[in-house]
Regions:
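Core beta-strand elements of the Rossmann-like FAD/NAD(P) dinucleotide-binding domain
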Residues: 126-132
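Glycine-rich dinucleotide-binding loop and its adjacent helix/turn
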Residues: 137-152
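C-terminal motif of bacterial Sec signal peptides marking the signal peptidase cleavage site
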Residues: 25-26
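A conserved short coil-to-beta-strand element within the FAD-binding core of flavoproteins
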Residues: 108-116
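Redox-cofactor binding/interface segments in oxidoreductases and associated redox assembly factors
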Residues: 122, 135-136
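N-terminal secretory signal peptides and thylakoid transit peptides that target proteins
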Residues: 1-22
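Beta1-alpha1 glycine-rich phosphate/pyrophosphate-binding loop at the start
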Residues: 29-104, 148-149
Length: 152
């Protein structure tokens, strides 16, 4: 038996896959109606989850990804930009790949999630119903929370 070292990318894929698989069964509905999953956040976690929920359900789940930004910058390889090996444009992509997989991409900001009514409210005033919601907004540094720390 050999031991394999897993990369951070492998761990992320396995984590997203676990979330996706756990959500698939929960979205099953009667009479052939499609389940609805709303994914909040279009970073690595949210985008991967949205893609694989759609793929693994063979189109049986309506997946909507909500992300305010129209493009995604791959931060894990951003050191290549700092080092001059790449330009930021080479690490930036839009969400068309998810759309090709059947994911509905909405560029807006979530203002509230009502778990009782199963609704997501957007800054535009639109509400989206869901059977399951995946919240993956990414990180936000709160420098002011650490004494002596400030943004560069």
């Amino acid at each position: 038996m050999s031991i394999r070292n897993y990369s951070r990318r492998d761990v992320l894929k396995f984590s997203a896959a676990g979330v996706a698989v756990g959500t698939l069964g929960a979205c099953a509905t009667s009479a052939g109606a499609k389940g609805k999953v709303v994914v909040v956040g279009g970073g690595w976690g949210g985008s991967t989850t949205a893609k694989y929920l759609r793929l693994w359900s063979d189109g049986g789940i309506d997946v909507t990804l909500i992300e305010p930004n129209t493009s995604f910058v791959s931060c894990p390889i951003s050191n290549l930009v700092i080092g001059g090996s790449r330009r930021i444009e080479q690490l930036t992509t839009n969400y068309d790949g998810l759309r090709r997989h059947g994911v509905n991409v909405v560029h807006d900001t979530v203002t509230a999630i009502d778990p009782d009514k199963r609704l997501v409210r957007l800054a535009s005033g639109q509400t989206l119903p869901f059977d399951r919601a995946v919240v993956s907004p990414g990180i936000e540094f709160m420098f002011e929370q650490v004494k002596g720390m400030s943004p560069a």
